[in-house]
């Protein structure tokens, strides 16, 4: 099913009782990129993880909880295998930190070491994280495509030579599958592009084509990005997916080309969707 036999996925493991950064398992990004990208990366971006089950003890032994947000840069050398991150976070449950900031710094240092890049960590109070929203643009899910297939097929993407305003399209129908366990991964995928006009029905068909595909969230988004870039003479492109949570974690990869409006990107990633 995959060559990720060295990960925790699909294996019975014992939950840790003590803080252990060694639980984190990196997976080199180059494993997937070598088949998609030649030369310099055509994108930049970030993988935004949300940790809903995060707790530790203070110096008196009192438990604290938070929602954690981890920003892993797309140019880091590795992604972090999700089950290993879950077990790492559970290893914090009985560990004592003198302050909340000490806990944040420890998590940031451990994740940065595992990812091979500087990971930004923010800890939110539970009552400050009720930010459910919607994505901007047009949902294509009410349209009908001429054909549906269930393995990724870039030839499904169609463009028309009618340059116009910047497009924003999204679909709630993205489904991919874990490359180790085969478990389904559900997501909403959003694209923003300028240059040639992307035919919305073709984007719908392309999104559906991932339904039988097995790969990690980050790799799926990068494939969508490279297929869109290859299919049309686009001036700018951004691809963003918000995956539903599993094991108390969700992963939300964002990839974009060129210069993007920082304020617009901040507004885009600041909201989670209802399924999360």
Swiss-Prot record:
Q: Which GO BP terms, alphabetically? A: queuosine biosynthetic process; tRNA modification
Taxonomic superkingdom: Bacteria
NCBIfam families tied to this protein: QueF
- Return the protein name: NADPH-dependent 7-cyano-7-deazaguanine reductase
State the function annotated in the UniProt record.
Catalyzes the NADPH-dependent reduction of 7-cyano-7-deazaguanine (preQ0) to 7-aminomethyl-7-deazaguanine (preQ1).
Q: What positions constitute the catalytic site?
A: 178, 185
Q: Which SUPFAM superfamilies match?
A: Tetrahydrobiopterin biosynthesis enzymes-like (SSF55620)
A Pfam family cross-referenced in the UniProt record is QueF
Give the binding site residues for substrate.
80-82, 217-218
Q: Where in the cell is it found?
A: Cytoplasm
Q: Which reaction does it catalyse?
A: 7-aminomethyl-7-carbaguanine + 2 NADP(+) = 7-cyano-7-deazaguanine + 2 NADPH + 3 H(+)
Keywords on this record?
Answer: Cytoplasm, NADP, Oxidoreductase, Queuosine biosynthesis
Entries under InterPro entries matching the protein: GTP-CH-I_C/QueF, NADPH_dep_7-cyano-7-deazaG_red, QueF, QueF_N, QueF_type2
Q: In which pathway does it act?
A: tRNA modification; tRNA-queuosine biosynthesis
Query: What HAMAP family does the record point to?
Result: QueF_type2
Q: Name one GO molecular function term.
A: preQ1 synthase activity
The similarity annotation says: Belongs to the GTP cyclohydrolase I family. QueF type 2 subfamily.
What residues does NADPH bind to?
Answer: 82-83, 246-247
What coarse category fits the chief subcellular location reported for this protein?
cytoplasm
């Amino acid at each position: 099913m995959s060559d990720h036999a060295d990960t925790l996925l699909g294996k019975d493991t014992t939950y840790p009782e003590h803080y252990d950064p060694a639980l984190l398992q990196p997976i080199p990004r180059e494993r997937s990129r070598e088949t998609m990208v030649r030369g310099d990366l055509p994108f930049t971006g970030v993988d935004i993880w949300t940790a809903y089950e995060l707790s530790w003890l203070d110096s008196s032994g009192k438990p604290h909880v938070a929602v954690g947000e981890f920003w892993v840069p797309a140019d880091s050398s590795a992604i972090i295998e999700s089950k290993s991150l879950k077990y790492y976070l559970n290893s914090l449950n009985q560990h004592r930190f003198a302050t909340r900031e000490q806990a944040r710094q420890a998590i940031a240092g451990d994740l940065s070491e595992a990812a091979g890049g500087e990971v930004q960590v923010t800890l939110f109070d539970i009552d400050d994280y009720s930010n459910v929203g919607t994505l901007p643009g047009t949902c294509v899910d009410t349209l009908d495509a001429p054909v549906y297939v269930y393995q990724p097929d870039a030839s499904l993407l169609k463009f028309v030579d009618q340059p116009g305003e910047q497009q924003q399209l999204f679909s709630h129908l993205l489904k991919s599958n874990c490359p180790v366990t085969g478990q389904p991964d559900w997501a909403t995928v959003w694209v923003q592009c300028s240059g040639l006009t992307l035919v919305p029905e073709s984007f719908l068909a392309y999104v559906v084509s991932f339904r039988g595909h097995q790969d990690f969230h980050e790799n799926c988004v990068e494939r969508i990005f490279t297929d869109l870039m290859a299919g049309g003479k686009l001036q700018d492109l951004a691809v963003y997916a918000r995956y539903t949570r599993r094991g108390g974690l969700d992963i939300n990869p964002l990839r974009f080309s060129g210069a993007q409006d920082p304020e617009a990107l901040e507004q885009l990633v600041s909201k989670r969707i209802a399924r999360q």
